Design a protein with these regions (language model features):
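Recognition helix of helix-turn-helix/homeodomain-like DNA-binding domains
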Residues: 28-45
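Helix-turn-helix/homeodomain-like alpha-helical modules used for DNA recognition
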Residues: 65-105
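Short Lys/Arg-enriched helix C-cap and helix-to-coil transition segments
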Residues: 44-59
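Short alpha-helical "recognition helix" segments of helix-turn-helix
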Residues: 23-24
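A short, Lys/Arg-rich alpha-helix, primarily the initiator
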Residues: 1-15
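N-terminal core-binding DNA-recognition domain of tyrosine recombinases/integrases
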Residues: 58-66
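Residues at alpha-helix boundaries and the short loops/turns that link adjacent helices
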Residues: 14-17, 43
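Helix-turn-helix DNA-binding elements, focusing on the entry/boundary residues of the two helices
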Residues: 20
Length: 105
């Protein structure tokens, strides 16, 4: 399983995406972006991955706000938050490594 498949499967498990179009939108791109990149054997751009990471951060912030305002999260939402957190950190680590390695797209 490549990185993109891992990200997709985890975000699907967390309930954030239902299909590749949803993931494309979270990356700030058109519907077919993810399927097109996969078909061409290319990784998503740094811009798309940064956009995705910041959208995941916003999702986590919304969950934190829910808790802050006194609402309890269900066990499923807590698991989803943990998955989203892991995916976000994975993406940021990958972006950092690519930028340090000079692999800008």
């Amino acid at each position: 399983m490549n990185d993109l498949d891992w990200i997709y499967e985890n975000l699907r498990e967390a309930g954030l995406v239902q299909n590749q179009n949803d993931l494309s939108h979270l990356c700030g791109m058109d519907d077919s972006y993810i399927s097109s990149r996969k078909a061409k054997g290319k990784e998503p751009s740094l811009e798309a991955m940064a956009h995705l990471a910041f959208n995941l951060e916003a999702e986590l912030q919304a969950l934190e706000d829910t808790i802050r305002y006194g609402e309890d999260l269900t066990a499923d939402r807590l698991v989803a938050a943990s998955i989203i957190y892991d995916v976000k950190n994975h993406i940021f680590a990958d972006l950092k490594a690519k930028c340090r390695g000079g692999r800008h797209e």
